[in-house]
Amino acid sequence: MTSRNYLLLTPGPLTTSRTVKEAMLFDSCTWDDDYNIGVVEQIRQQLTEMATASEGYTSVLLQGSGSYAVEAVLGSALGPQDKVLIVSNGAYGARMVEMAGLMGIAHHAYDCGEVARPDVQAIDAILNADPTISHIAMVHSETTTGMLNPIDEVGTLAHRYGKTYIVDAMSSFGGIPMDIAALHIDYLISSANKCIQGVPGFAFVIAREQKLAACKGRSRSLSLDLYAQWRCMEDNHGKWRFTSPTHTVLAFAQALKELAKEGGVAARHQRYQQNQRSLVAGMRALGFNTLLDDELHSPIITAFYSPEDPQYRFSEFYRRLKEQGFVIYPGKVSQSDCFRIGNIGEVYAADITALLTAIRTAMYWTK
């Protein structure tokens, strides 16, 4: 265990503010109205309002990581006669395919490759050829590569074909402006420890109430029953079915205040975008190349090719950066040797400048 605090250049968990951390110093009783009505219900309302101004949506909080909520949605939203088209171009789309397989959910996996943008015409053709498909699921910000996927165009298709639309917006919600009603999204999934800049411990689903109501009795899991979790919160003023991660929830409530103070999602998006552009420009000046073309990048995380120098080892590069107080991500692309640097969380222009200086110092293979 180290007492040193690092700047996390990762897509979550990420570097949080001191005040978000301090919010966890308070102990809450999960039965108290002060907590359930005063904190949980306020969070649910704020999340829904952040997602859309349209009526008919609600928020459900669920213990666990983002993947728990993805599995809860897939396992609750699809009935035994339903079939989901899963658009996959990275590890997190592939994880949805794996979940569907394990739960015995009928699915069509459209895998367009890790460095390719999903082809909307191909998706159109799949939907046209297979009328048994009832749902579409895809990742918005695919952090495997840093790709930002076309949820708007796919949402238009979902609406035209009358399909239920599920979007994993784990690493984009709160950091990229969106109106989920305008995007025809029925279920949006995200997590406390991403763009809203809270800490790990729970995920959340923002969904059409009409769609949620139809999930009754469908869940393939007791703990991950999205309908039951929603009804418990609705009927008991924010109470969770099972033990609430109280400290994480308090941290998240503080993080929401800080998001508003920053100027909301639009202002945070601008900061993330500037961070990412400065990072890419600086890395290219140091001789690194990006995995994706610029027009495909999200403002969340960027994948860089590893240097071709035979002396280069990611583990040594990582160690030298960590010694200087910076933590980056290893690559997750199966076909390319790369590493990833995130720029969300409490990360500002001065931090990117300091990181680039540290990277220059850590480039031992150029000495």
Curated annotation (Swiss-Prot):
The free-text function statement in the UniProt record for this protein reads: Involved in phosphonate degradation.
The record lists the catalysed reaction(s) as: (2-aminoethyl)phosphonate + pyruvate = phosphonoacetaldehyde + L-alanine
For biological process, the GO terms are: organic phosphonate catabolic process
Residues modified as N6-(pyridoxal phosphate)lysine are 194
Origin: domain of life: Bacteria
| Gene3D superfamilies given in the database record | Aspartate Aminotransferase, domain 1 (3.90.1150.10), Type I PLP-dependent aspartate aminotransferase-like (Major domain) (3.40.640.10)
Q: What is its EC number?
A: 2.6.1.37
The text of the family note is:
Belongs to the class-V pyridoxal-phosphate-dependent aminotransferase family. PhnW subfamily.
Question: How is the subunit organization of this protein annotated in UniProt?
Answer: Homodimer.
Q: What is this protein called?
A: 2-aminoethylphosphonate--pyruvate transaminase
* Enzyme class (EC, first level): transferase
Q: What taxonomic ancestry is recorded?
A: Bacteria, Pseudomonadati, Pseudomonadota, Gammaproteobacteria, Enterobacterales
